[in-house]
Design a protein with these regions (language model features):
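Small-residue (G/A/S/T)-rich helix-start motifs and N-terminal tracts that mark the onset
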Residues: 1-119, 128-143, 150, 154-277
Length: 277
């Protein structure tokens, strides 16, 4: 097991070509939000764009579309009820933040994992669907990223006594299923089974609602930009934590909001680039 250090991250992070255009940086697809829970979609979308995706489409319920259009005009919008789910024309997919777990959500989840041939991240309510529809696990494409917090992890894989037990299970499941697991926590684990990293950035300010939604957006953005899924997960977790550390210069861990973290992502990228010179 390795530490996710700044020096290592600098070896895998690619600075942007000054002459590039939006088409060079991928088209991310996020499926997020539901009635009364659109904050998760807004947070994931903002984080995705701040992490560098060239284009972003967010699939939301029709009645909630105005929330996203006002909050993040840079994102394109698709309506959940009429979207054709021709998903493989996108560069990467992140799904689950506050989507709900009703029959319609299960239908969408099943449709996506059955047809997906592009990088995929499963989070939040999509993980909760998976925990109650275990037969769907075998349909998950190889290389898919799962991003559970400890309670979601236990719902998926059974109760564990402590973090060490969860880490052991995560490593074994990742290897067995050929997937990537990001086990979120104080020291987040990123594992492909064959190789595992412990994150070295972040602080207690991330211990509040919206943090996981932002991480979903960030990792999905990196996948859309062409990073291999395991690399995207490493970059996403590290940048997410580094931005929180930078935000802590202006906020306390008690007062920090995930919007403070997202607004600190530019400084996080600059820190990586400046320190690598």
């Amino acid at each position: 097991m390795y530490n996710l250090s700044e020096s290592y991250i600098q070896t895998i992070f690619k600075s942007r070509n000054p002459s590039s255009h939006k088409g060079d940086h991928g088209h991310a697809l996020l499926i997020a939000g539901s009635k009364g829970r659109m904050g998760a979609a807004v947070i994931a979308a903002r984080a995705c764009m701040r992490a560098g995706a060239g284009l972003l489409t967010v699939v939301v319920p029709e009645d909630e579309r105005s929330v996203l259009q006002i909050a993040i005009p840079e994102a394109m919008l698709a309506i959940r009820q009429t979207f054709d789910y021709d998903i493989n024309k996108f560069s990467a997919i992140g799904m689950g933040p506050a989507t709900g777990t009703d029959e319609y959500a299960v239908e969408i989840f099943t449709k996506i994992i059955s047809a997906c041939t592009i990088p995929l991240l499963i989070d939040a309510d999509a993980l909760n669907i998976l925990s109650t529809e275990k037969k769907l696990f075998d349909r998950i494409p190889a290389g898919t990223i799962l991003t559970p917090h400890p309670k979601e992890f236990d719902r998926l894989f059974g109760l564990h006594k402590n973090e060490d037990e969860r880490r052991t299970t995560a490593i074994n499941i990742a290897e067995e299923k050929d997937i990537i697991i990001v086990l979120k926590g104080h020291k987040t684990l990123i594992t492909s089974g064959g190789k595992s990293f412990i994150n070295t950035t972040g602080n207690a300010g991330l211990a509040k609602g919206g943090s996981g939604d932002a991480l979903t957006g960030i990792i999905t953005s990196f996948m859309a930009q062409g990073y291999e899924c395991f690399t995207a997960a490493q970059l996403g977790v590290y940048i997410h934590g580094l931005a929180a550390d930078i935000a802590l210069n202006r906020q306390s861990s008690e007062s920090m909001l995930i919007t403070d973290v997202i607004e600190s992502m530019g400084e996080a990228f600059k820190t990586l680039l400046n320190d690598s010179v």
